Structure formats: C-alpha cells, structure tokens
C-alpha cells in the first residue's frame, strides 16, 4: 500500500488507535509523512494558480493521527522544557543543519517538528505549528503565530502579533493561505481557511474569517473566504438593512498591481484611504 492509502485507512479507524495499539506499519507511515512535511517534500496544500489550491487531505489526516500514536513526554529544546507529543523542529540541530536550512531563528522562536521553514525566512519570537509551510523570504515577526497546516507564501511579512489560523482545533476543511508578496498588518487575524491572494496588503487590526464580509468600495462587490489579488484592506463596518446598527466588515479600499506594489511602501498604500 502507498503511504497515502495507509494513512487514509488508518484515519477511518482513528478512534481505535492509541500509542499501544498502533501497528508498526501505520506508525511508520505517520512518522514518514511528518518527516516529509518537515523537509518540505510534502505540503498540506499545493498551489495550482493565483487563488487556486489543491489540499492534500491525507497529509492533514497524518498530522491528526500523529497525536494519537504518541504519548506526552518531557521535551527539552536546550532552553525550555515542554510536556508534549511533538518535539520542536530544531531541538537537536547542529550549526551545520541551521546553515543548510538557511533561515534565522532568534531567541524565543518556536517551530514544531512537521513544519517547514524555507531559506531566508526570519523567525522572530513567534510560533509555527505542525504542518505549516513558510516559504522563502518570509518574515514572521514578534508574537506572530502560524497555525497548523497554514501556508505562507514567498516574501510575506507577518507583522507583530498576527494570527494565521490553523485547521486542527477546531477542525477545518482547508488551511488558511497567505499567497506570495502579501503584507499582514500588526494584530490582524486571518482564520478558517481564508485565502489572501497574491500581493495583497492587510492593514493593522483586520479580522477575517469565512463569514466576514469583504466589501470592495470601488465595485460594490462583496467577497467571503478570499481576499482578491492586489487588494488593500482595512477594517470597516456595514449598516444593517433597517439602519439601526452596523456590523464589522473588511473593506477593500483600492487595488494595486505588482509594479505599483514594488515601487510603493506599505505606509504609502495605506495613506489617503
């Protein structure tokens, strides 16, 4: 049986799987899948085009199964002690392994094993959960969190305190995805499998989930579940039909192309809106 088939079959019987009952075949399949996620050979989601992604459900199932096949134990990353089922990504790394990986991890940065961090990424004191993929040149700033199985594109900037939602708790169908060259402003939250498409700028303190209305003030269109390519987004509100109250929404105040984005600072894009 293929790795995928073993995982799929085991997941159907997951309620019966424990650290003592798991078969050697299933355990090795789960651990091998986690190793492939950790190395970047496998991803929970693969990009087909702008805003188009294929989710590898079986890889996500392997992540869930990994919690059933291992007991909690005392873990040590050299600085802190943990009591968990998942070791940190670089707990046992040598200097050569860090050099080969090619990213920076400052004191206080935590990534769990099973997450992938590409070259030229900077991890400030932040948290990258299992199954996540952080692509080349991304900045994960102080107190930012990258949730389980989330996909972070090339040259993305996650500002201080940003939260990118995971899929494991509560269980979600698709991971949250931030495509290439996006900027997510401080303390913003993108969750529940929302896709922020390439080259978008999310201002500080914007909260977007699947039910959040995303209003394009230029066209009058309302989006949900995705931020279109090149959008500049701020917090806003929409009036109720009877005008008695307003409810939170996100507002697309303008669109920018890659050329404009390259020539313009984020601060300039958010001025005069």
Swiss-Prot record:
It is an enzyme of class 2 (transferase). It catalyses: (S)-2,3,4,5-tetrahydrodipicolinate + succinyl-CoA + H2O = (S)-2-succinylamino-6-oxoheptanedioate + CoA. InterPro entries: DapD_Trfase_Hexpep_rpt_fam, Hexapep, Hexapep_transf_CS, THP_succinylTrfase_dom1, THP_succinylTrfase_N_sf, Trimer_LpxA-like_sf. It comes from the Bacteria. It holds the Pfam family THDPS_N_2. Keywords: Acyltransferase, Amino-acid biosynthesis, Cytoplasm, Diaminopimelate biosynthesis, Lysine biosynthesis, Repeat, Transferase. CDD domains: LbH_THP_succinylT. Its main location: cytoplasm. Pathway: Amino-acid biosynthesis; L-lysine biosynthesis via DAP pathway; LL-2,6-diaminopimelate from (S)-tetrahydrodipicolinate (succinylase route): step 1/3. Homotrimer. NCBIfam families: dapD (TIGR00965), PRK11830.1 (NF008808). This is 2,3,4,5-tetrahydropyridine-2,6-dicarboxylate N-succinyltransferase. It comes from Neisseria meningitidis serogroup C / serotype 2a (strain ATCC 700532 / DSM 15464 / FAM18). The gene is dapD.
